Amino acid sequence: MSLSTIAEVKTFLLALQDRICTQLAQADGSAVFNEDRWTREEGGGGRSRVLTEGAVFEQAGVNFSHVSGATLPASATAHRPELAGRSFQAMGVSLVIHPRSPYIPTSHANVRFFIAEKPGEEPVWWFGGGFDLTPFYGFEEDAVHWHRTAERLCAPFGEQVYPKYKKWCDDYFFIKHRNEARGIGGLFFDDLNTPDFATCFAFTQAVGEGFLEAYLPIVEKRKTLSWGDHERQFQLYRRGRYVEFNLVWDRGTLFGLQTGGRTESILMSMPPLVRWEYNYQPAEDSPEAALYRDFLPVRDWLKEPE
């Protein structure tokens, strides 16, 4: 694989970060992203961008990183012995958006590329990524729009792509110690290296570029709804589930913290405010109860009317 090919992936990722930040700032209308450029002693660096205290977004972080090293840590090669002794590069864009309104869902997306090389041998490479939605108050039309957008971007790559990566997302973003989903899912893929580089890169681009198409219409539709302290307290309580998943189960967070990654960028996904409540139970037939009953269980949203 040529250096120009790797550079093409990096160019796409940098432009994607720019585009997402620009459109999120426009949707917010009052706040801007502050950029923090950083370098990694072992190789590489990145640029972390965070918007705080906006009119629409309480906090939004969009991070680009490109790190490299002469060898991978043992934790990375334990299940992939073919990576031992190889130099590596890993690059990606990762974002988490925590809206101010409880009626706008939290959302997460990332796209990433990994390559490990050794003189005289073929490189080992793959793409990964996806996006998922975590509502506090469910709206069926939003869930249908989210999943139909995901299905449309997958369609050119095969009819089995959406159901495969939808199921992977449902399985991955599951909080095992709570026995409940983090949200309503979306797409999740990893270790993608077939049928060829061009197809894998094109799919990864489609996912990255499709995120705002899926998310921003929901933001625009819900940002003018009025809400009060009751809804805010439930939002803060449900944010606790987000924290629990990221710190206990998320592979990317754990890998970054265990391998000396940049902590500020890794924990950029944390919400600015959160609360826990012992043995909370939503009132029967309340909008809060509807989240648990109608939205967190796995559903085929494509069967619902748009």
Curated annotation (Swiss-Prot):
The lineage of its organism: Bacteria, Pseudomonadati, Pseudomonadota, Gammaproteobacteria, Enterobacterales. One of its GO terms (cellular component) is cytoplasm. Involved in the heme biosynthesis. Catalyzes the aerobic oxidative decarboxylation of propionate groups of rings A and B of coproporphyrinogen-III to yield the vinyl groups in protoporphyrinogen-IX. Keywords: Cytoplasm, Heme biosynthesis, Metal-binding, Oxidoreductase, Porphyrin biosynthesis. The record marks 177 as: Important for dimerization. It is found in: Cytoplasm. The active site is at residue 108. Its cofactor is a divalent metal cation. Its EC number is 1.3.3.3. One of its GO terms (molecular function) is coproporphyrinogen oxidase activity. Pathway: Porphyrin-containing compound metabolism; protoporphyrin-IX biosynthesis; protoporphyrinogen-IX from coproporphyrinogen-III (O2 route): step 1/1. The keyword Metal-binding applies. Its main location: cytoplasm. This is Oxygen-dependent coproporphyrinogen-III oxidase. It catalyses: coproporphyrinogen III + O2 + 2 H(+) = protoporphyrinogen IX + 2 CO2 + 2 H2O. Transmembrane segments: none annotated. Belongs to the aerobic coproporphyrinogen-III oxidase family. One of its GO terms (biological process) is protoporphyrinogen IX biosynthetic process. Homodimer. The keyword Oxidoreductase applies. A divalent metal cation binds at residues 98, 108, 147, 177. Residues 242-277 are annotated as: Important for dimerization. The gene is hemF. InterPro entries: Coprogen_oxidase_aer, Coprogen_oxidase_aer_sf, Coprogen_oxidase_CS. Substrate binds at residues 94, 110-112, 260-262.
